[in-house]
Amino acid sequence: MVKLITVIGHGVNLLPHFIEHYQKHVDEINIAVYETELYPNLNEEVTEVIKNYENVNIIIKVQERIFDWEKVTQLYNFVKSKQKNSWYVIADIDEFHLYPNDDLRELIKDCEENSWDIVRGGFIDRIGRGGEFSELKDDVSLWEQFPNAGFFRYPMSKACPNKICVMRGYVDVTAGQHYAKIDDHTTWRWQGWNHPLIAPVKTHSVQVHHFKWDSTSIDRVLNVANINEDYAFSSEYFQMYKELKRTNFKIDLVNPEYMFELGLTKSEFSGYKNWNKLIKKIISL
């Protein structure tokens, strides 16, 4: 059995898209609801959305300070620790995985046969037509609404693009789910290269398509920046907001550093042609 865990801390607009994307890959979708003073009724909102879906459940609800990404990571690790040998997918609500050959179960089968317990991945940033921060529509595929795939957040703000995507329950992840922590060592850079428990990224890596950048994201970036706290990584968000403001809140689709491929309207792993080049870059950062 393969289980997905997601922590929801703001809004439910993406949740139907998220569920429909992952249901074909996993057996269960487990939701941790992270309520804050800004979203005090989030549990009710999530409950309303998921009532018509099978095998989608709220498994824990907490009330914490807003934008504490370290607490979010603690929730992921806490839930996974209950079944240490089980396979888990972890993904934030705006993170949509694409797997090699579009087959998660084949990926996990390879891991079991080779004694790999961790699969890494990296962000591909999605943006609307013309580089715009488009308004999210409920009845149109996300891939069609945000057809442009690239790598702009790291060049703009130096936010870490590494992600730990698939793992057994005993594997802890670090803040932001960017690296695994094994025997008190993280898998950052050389510590993760050729690690015997990590599937080789050249053949077994996950594309994390980041549908963060809709019309509401600019205000959220500013709100996190204004918290001005290390636990919220506010300095990175401030840098991102500053860069977005400088570019008139529009992403340059022809900047070669951003590695854009345009018009990718289907959820296919093979769609983004420069993936091998990009993941090699990501794990070096």
Language-model-detected regions and their locations in the chain:
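Catalytic-site signature of metal-activated, phosphate-bearing donor transferases
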Residues: D68-T73, Y99-L285
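Active-site-proximal specificity loops/subdomain of glycosyltransferases
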Residues: E37-A91, L98-Y99
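Short internal beta-strands
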Residues: I29-E35
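Short, high-confidence coil segments that cap the C-terminus of an alpha-helix
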Residues: V26, K84-N85, E113-W116
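N-proximal low-complexity "stem/linker" segments adjacent to membrane-targeting elements
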Residues: M1-E20
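Structural beta-sheet core signal
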Residues: L4-T6, I31, I118
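Short, acidic, metal-binding catalytic loop of nucleotide-sugar glycosyltransferases
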Residues: E20-I29
